[in-house]
């Protein structure tokens, strides 16, 4: 009796910052593995999300947003991580936002024109477009820019038409053995996911100025005798004023961040979590390429 066929391939999700790439990945997977925020540049590493359904395994790479600004070392490394994802995949999902088209979108498109992989254009946040009459002409404009495999208007947040994207992906997966066991949803370690959860809470609860000058290092990640995890997180900021902002009045802000992060970790790890957070000033970390690599920012480039 012949063996059943299996299909497997890598799909890059690309686009400028803040178009909803991470939300789309989370919706495609049916659960949250990539951090989301209304602020741009929330994704700093390439996150691999794995969706297995029967004989099909889609391995999604959620890239940092590509953007023109490369003054700081962290921006250069993020652009390098995003660009390197484009070259070694079977399929690309190019995410744009509603009827907006910017110089950063154009830059991403130019990179995709040079690539070999077919491109699905995902026009996200169409439910937020105020003038619906503008949508069709804009879709026609987009269609003229490149020979896309398909163009799908969708809402990653509500889930509208995300199943259409998943269906197109399945159709174009090459015949291959699965790279991961069927119960895997990411190749990232629990330690890494813990740092991402803390970073998301920092994004959510702090002002607009801070998040790009903050990163998280997990100094301790151990199982305990209660069957749970003891986790110590170090929050690095660039200035003393930022440290005060993270801690908040009488420690109120860092307490809220810790409580919310612990809840998400317990949901993700399905075990009790004891979380302790500290804040430390490390000036210039976002401009120091060696420091960035020591924090894991160059690992996937």
From Swiss-Prot:
Keyword Cytoplasm: yes
Residue span of region G5: 154-156
Region named G1: 15-22
InterPro entries given in the database record: G_ERA_dom (IPR030388), GTP-bd (IPR006073), GTPase_Era-like (IPR005662), KH_dom-like_a/b (IPR015946), KH_dom_type_2 (IPR004044), KH_sf_prok-type (IPR009019), P-loop_NTPase (IPR027417), Small_GTP-bd (IPR005225)
Keyword annotations of the record: Cell inner membrane, Cell membrane, Cytoplasm, GTP-binding, Membrane, Nucleotide-binding, Ribosome biogenesis, RNA-binding, rRNA-binding
Region called G3, residue ranges: 62-65
Compartments it resides in: Cytoplasm; Cell inner membrane
UniProt region (G4), positions on chain: 124-127
Chain positions covered by the region annotation G2: 41-45
Pfam family, one: MMR_HSR1
GO biological process: ribosomal small subunit assembly
UniProt topology in membrane: Peripheral membrane protein
Highest rank taxon of the organism: Bacteria
Boundaries of every KH type-2 domain copy: 198-283
Molecular-function GO terms, alphabetical: GTP binding; GTPase activity; ribosomal small subunit binding; small ribosomal subunit rRNA binding
Function: An essential GTPase that binds both GDP and GTP, with rapid nucleotide exchange. Plays a role in 16S rRNA processing and 30S ribosomal subunit biogenesis and possibly also in cell cycle regulation and energy metabolism.
Assembly and oligomerization: Monomer.
Protein's name in the database: GTPase Era
Top-level taxonomy: Bacteria, Pseudomonadati, Pseudomonadota, Gammaproteobacteria, Enterobacterales
